[in-house]
């Protein structure tokens, strides 16, 4: 599905990713973990064509897509859901979804079926369909952002910290819904997330980024190794800041 091989990304002269390899198979959920500033969001933006890839290769659905623009990636079936700025606040829930469906070819019945698919996954959005996105709760807004992407029938979702700012009970519900999306829509997911404990309940594979480099890649079932890697990063961060680990 998605193959990233040896990519480098920089902001001007400042390199943020170095020789990164990552793969996401069909209908798989891959968790991308690491501290703030490790390069997780930059990796998603590079894959999606929002940041230039200086070296390496991105392949999606059998085609090389390195440095293709976001509209080209979306047309192939890839969608990025950023952490912020992911809905139109002055539009209703239904109008947000309708905009998401603009890329979906077909008759009105096809669009109606997609609405039903989304509302079936996120029932609260059906109840709130006449409400403006600006009055939604944080959890409802994240559900709407993901649903807008789903309206285009994607093959791959790139989710950038969807649980940020949510209460613990909402985090659990959101992750269960993400797992349901994989089952019901057949999509693959590359999930950037700080809430590692909850994310490990739904991901199949894990990659850990440290200072722009992959330091661990393996099955989510290898929790001991994942915890050791993250503990090492925590300890290194505390020591470098002068705090006691």
Regions found by a protein language model. Name each.
Residues 172-185:
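Helical segment within the ABC ATPase nucleotide-binding domain
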Residues 151-155:
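A short, proline-enriched helix->beta-strand linker immediately N-terminal to the Walker B motif
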Residues 48:
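Helix-to-loop junction immediately C-terminal to a conserved catalytic motif
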Residues 132-136:
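Conserved ABC ATPase signature
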Residues 56-65, 76, 110-115, 216-218:
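Conserved ABC transporter NBD signature motif
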């Amino acid at each position: 599905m998605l193959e990233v091989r040896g990519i480098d990304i920089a902001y001007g002269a400042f390199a943020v990713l170095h020789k990164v390899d990552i793969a996401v198979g069909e209908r798989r959920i891959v968790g991308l973990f690491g501290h703030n500033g490790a390069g997780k969001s930059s990796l998603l933006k590079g894959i999606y064509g929002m940041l230039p890839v200086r070296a390496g290769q991105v392949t999606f659905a059998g085609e090389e897509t390195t440095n293709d623009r976001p509209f080209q990636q979306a047309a192939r079936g890839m969608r990025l859901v950023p952490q912020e700025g992911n809905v139109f606040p002055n539009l209703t829930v239904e109008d947000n979804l309708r905009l998401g469906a603009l890329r979906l070819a077909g008759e009105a019945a096809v669009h109606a079926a997609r609405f039903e698919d989304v509302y079936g996954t996120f029932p609260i959005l059906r109840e709130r369909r006449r409400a403006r996105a600006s009055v939604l709760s944080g959890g409802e807004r994240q559900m709407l952002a993901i649903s807008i992407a789903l309206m285009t029938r994607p093959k791959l979702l790139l989710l950038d910290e969807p649980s940020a700012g949510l209460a613990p009970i909402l985090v659990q519900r959101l992750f269960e819904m993400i797992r349901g999306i994989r089952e019901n829509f057949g999509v693959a997911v590359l999930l950037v997330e700080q809430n590692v404990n909850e994310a490990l309940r739904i991901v199949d594979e894990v990659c850990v980024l440290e200072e722009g480099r992959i330091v661990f890649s393996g099955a989510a079932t290898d929790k001991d190794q994942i915890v050791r890697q993250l503990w090492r990063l925590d300890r290194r961060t505390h020591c470098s800041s002068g705090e006691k680990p």
